Design a protein with these regions (language model features):
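Cell-envelope/extracellular polymer assembly enzymes that use nucleotide-activated donors
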Residues: 4-7, 37
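Acidic donor-binding segment of Leloir-type glycosyltransferases
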Residues: 26-61
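Conserved donor-nucleotide/metal-binding helix-loop-beta segment in metal-dependent transferases, i.e.
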Residues: 96-121
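Short beta-strand-to-loop element that shapes/binds the nucleotide-sugar donor at the catalytic cleft/hinge
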Residues: 117-137
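C-terminal catalytic/acceptor-binding lobe
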Residues: 162, 167-261
Length: 261
């Protein structure tokens, strides 16, 4: 298989069962064959963590303490071989086949080459549980968010239940099969994303720092930067087998969507 010029950076913490399920999905749908640079950063690493990574012949960064997401992202980025980074966490299961995955990642590279800043890859139809933005279904333009200090900073996430390019064409448009907008309407998220290493290190981390409160620190600043964001049908479903083991996650999220109608 053709290799993509992408470093796949996976952050994991204290959840071997979920990581094992996630890596099985990456192997099943060929993601592990699409890059020659795949590394897992383990926080509070255990012997089981290390053995699991060795089973898949993955490079590892082993930490005995929990250093927080900001510092962990920085270490992963600094150690990435390629300028393009696909950032994942241990609970993002790949649900699309090999051809779709490869094609969607190639399109993502095209967006980065067209000067887009972030390409997001959470599955549109099967996002997994929880989907926090669902609380804004029906009032997408009518809520104020304290973190971001503005209205509707999560508007792009409405793509999970409607077509935002049709509903909000002055704010979100389509480019091919991808929705495109700016960071004013697409909050920063640690959900799966493709980004340039230089953008992550020089712009994001230089502002947000290495704090455990990374997402909150960046929120208000992010909405004012006019960064270019793209998101298509997506590839990954949130599936944390430790936190949410009892229910089928897709069934649970669909049920919640129906309850909001």
């Amino acid at each position: 298989m053709e290799k993509l010029p992408i470093s796949i950076c996976i952050l994991s913490w204290n959840n071997v069962k979920t990581l094992e399920n996630t890596l099985k999905s990456y192997q099943k749908f060929g993601l592990l064959e699409m890059s020659e640079d795949i590394v897992v950063l383990f926080q509070e690493a255990s012997e089981k963590d290390v053995k699991l990574a060795e089973t898949y012949q993955l490079k590892t960064i082993i930490l005995k303490e929990n250093i927080g997401i900001g510092k962990a992202i920085k270490i992963l980025a600094e150690n990435a071989k390629f300028e393009n980074i696909l950032f994942l966490e241990n609970d993002w299961q790949l649900i699309e086949n090999e051809n779709t995955t490869f094609h969607q990642l190639k399109i993502g590279l095209d967006f980065l080459n067209k000067k887009y800043d972030v390409v997001r890859y959470r599955s549109r139809k099967k996002p997994g549980y929880p989907l926090h933005s669902l609380k804004h279904k029906g009032n997408e333009l009518d809520y104020f968010d304290d973190w971001h200090n503005c209205t509707s900073p999560h508007l792009l996430e409405s793509l999970h239940w409607l077509d935002p390019a049709k509903e909000f064409p002055d704010k979100i448009q389509k480019d091919g099969n991808f929705f495109v907008t700016t960071s004013r309407w697409a909050n920063w998220t640690n959900n799966p994303f493709l980004v340039k290493k230089s953008f992550l290190l020089d712009k994001i981390l230089s502002f947000a720092g290495e704090s455990v409160y990374f997402e909150r620190n960046i929120a208000e600043w992010w909405t004012k930067q006019n960064f270019k964001i793209a998101q298509g049908e997506g590839l990954f479903m949130h599936n944390d087998l430790a936190k949410y083991p009892k229910k089928n996650l897709f069934t649970k999220i669909i049920k919640r969507i129906k309850n909001l109608k």
